[in-house]
């Protein structure tokens, strides 16, 4: 597509735009998607699919692919009538076309890792289901009843993948075995989630419902035990020892997470240089914290500062909520457009102990607010604010919550596929990392400790670029960090030197990067593009440039691939 124009016209259409033929195709695809993937309807807070799951079998994957093919065929004969249409057409062709490439490669039959695969998704949807009424618990019981079929379909796909030499690495198989075992054990997720289930006022559920919850929870536990058995007896023996996926497969997944094809070796070299630059910044801040201190010494001083310590998850949650509420209140007054429904953001401690921090968006009508979740590793009960202030901004406002809630609220302009379905890591995570730097520019990280935390997060994302591309493509290790070519073992030591997190979190991140190739660099590469676009727009507009207007205009596009974003904001 070369017709796209600057999306500034999009806002002028707000409230008056009439849906087009291209919007109708996007809406039809979205409705089809909700039928094929009912859990996604729950994610969006759309009623009508509360007990169902997607078909995770090869037949289900093919049904999804066929829906994409039909949608692309329908778009072939349509012409865009405005800027919104041009972006929709560009984005759908890129996203659906790439998804079909991955399907045709067969790698969707090997979807298994420690963070974002059906092994986690089948369980995680319960985190988003209401628990405040009898009917809500009936829906939960119904979905628990369907866990065995969902797991069975998933096992069938993994088995078919193995027959085609499409298998995740042994490391991923083994960690998912551990996770699935924990979900299924006594006191594990399914047991603890349903035992003692009650209404918010403490009222007991009807006896028949309690019995069905117990029966269906036990069935879900048995299903996950069957997954563990399959992984151990069938998939593990077929799984390759090697973690590196190689250049061809990596390039495919990099495009999936970026929406752009980048020169991987140039990007790797940029990542090495960016890491060096951030370390130099950290060294200056360390000297501000204590003259002559190294970065590590400065961090130790910050860790030991009682004013920056939090004890227990309750204290962590309360601190997160207070900081988040303050950011929403202050930033809405001058820097960003934050409307009433967008202002509610809940900070949560996740019901799992896997080590991640993540955001889940609001329901389409905002009746369920956006939430940031902290999955605290077992045994960890002390936290430091200097590291996590920037995390709250990343996950909340002006990061993911502002980004996703802005798109969700743009129903006057965007179709539901643009608002709620399309998600590109390079765009979304790039924005959140851009938002962290933006908070520094706005004066919210003037405290040297908080600024060190932001730089620590930036350093981690730059190190991810080096690690992820270096290890998966087996490139040469930069002289500063060692010799020879990258291996996972060298990579672990490298991460340990560059990511200031607990051992539990480090192990989680290390395994994540190895099992989710191309995703980790998307943060820093997306930030790079966001900053390039912002600077180019500012240069073009000169004194007329207004940051609030630019950010609103950009975020109202929704999440799109990085090439689509650049065309939408820069091409006339």
PLM region descriptions:
Residues 1-572:
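N-terminal maturation segment of proteins
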């Amino acid at each position: 597509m070369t017709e796209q124009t600057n999306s500034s016209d999009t806002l002028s259409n707000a409230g008056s735009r009439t849906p087009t033929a291209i919007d109708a195709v996007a809406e039809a695809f979205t409705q089809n998607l909700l039928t094929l993937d009912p859990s996604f309807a729950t994610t969006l807070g759309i009623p009508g699919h509360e007990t169902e799951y997607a078909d995770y079998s090869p037949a289900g994957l093919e049904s999804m692919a066929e829906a994409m093919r039909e949608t692309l065929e329908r778009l072939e004969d349509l012409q865009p009538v405005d800027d919104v249409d041009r972006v929709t057409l560009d984005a759908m062709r890129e996203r659906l076309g790439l998804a079909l490439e991955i399907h045709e490669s067969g790698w969707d039959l090997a979807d298994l890792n420690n963070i974002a695969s059906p092994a986690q998704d089948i369980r995680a949807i319960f985190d988003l289901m209401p628990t405040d009424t009898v009917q809500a618990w009936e829906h939960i019981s119904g979905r628990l009843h369907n866990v065995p079929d969902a797991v069975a379909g998933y096992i069938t796909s993994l088995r078919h993948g193995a027959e085609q030499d499409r298998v995740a690495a042994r490391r991923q198989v083994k960690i998912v075995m551990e996770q699935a075992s924990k979900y299924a054990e006594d006191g594990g997720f399914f047991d603890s989630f349903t035992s003692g289930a009650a209404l918010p006022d403490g009222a007991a559920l009807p006896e028949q419902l309690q019995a069905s919850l117990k029966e269906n929870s036990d069935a879900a536990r048995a299903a996950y035990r069957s997954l563990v058995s399959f992984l151990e007896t069938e998939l593990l023996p077929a799984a390759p020892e090697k973690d590196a996926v190689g250049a061809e497969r990596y390039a495919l997944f990099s495009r999936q997470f970026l929406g752009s094809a980048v020169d991987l070796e140039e990007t790797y070299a940029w990542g090495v240089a960016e890491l060096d630059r951030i370390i130099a910044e950290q060294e200056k801040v360390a000297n501000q914290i204590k003259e002559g201190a190294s970065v590590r010494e400065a961090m130790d001083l910050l860790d030991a500062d009682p004013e920056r310590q939090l004890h227990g998850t309750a204290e962590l949650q309360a601190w997160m909520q207070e900081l988040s509420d303050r950011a929403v209140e202050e930033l809405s007054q001058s820097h960003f457009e934050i409307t009433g429904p967008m202002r509610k953001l809940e900070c949560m401690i996740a019901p799992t102990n896997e080590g991640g921090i993540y955001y889940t968006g609001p329901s389409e009508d905002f009746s369920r607010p956006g939430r940031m979740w902290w999955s605290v590793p077992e045994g960890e009960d002390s936290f430091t604010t200097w590291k996590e202030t920037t995390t709250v901004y990343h996950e909340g406002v002006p990061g993911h919550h502002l980004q996703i809630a802005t798109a969700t609220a743009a129903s006057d302009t965007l179709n539901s596929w643009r608002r709620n379905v399309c998600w590109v890591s390079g765009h979304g995570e790039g924005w959140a990392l851009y938002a962290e730097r933006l908070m520094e520019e706005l004066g919210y990280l003037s405290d040297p400790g908080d600024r060190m935390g932001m730089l620590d997060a930036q350093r981690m994302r730059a190190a991810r670029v080096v690690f992820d591309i270096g290890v998966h493509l087996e490139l040469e290790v930069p002289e500063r960090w060692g010799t020879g070519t990258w291996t996972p073992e060298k990579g672990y030591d490298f991460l340990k030197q560059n990511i200031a997190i607990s051992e539990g979190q480090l192990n989680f991140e290390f395994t994540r990067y190895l099992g989710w190739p191309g995703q980790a660099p998307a943060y820093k590469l997306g930030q790079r593009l966001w900053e390039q676009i912002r600077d180019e727009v500012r240069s073009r507009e000169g004194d007329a440039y207004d940051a609030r207007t630019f950010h609103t205009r950009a975020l109202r596009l929704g999440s799109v691939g990085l090439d689509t974003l650049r065309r939408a904001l820069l091409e006339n």
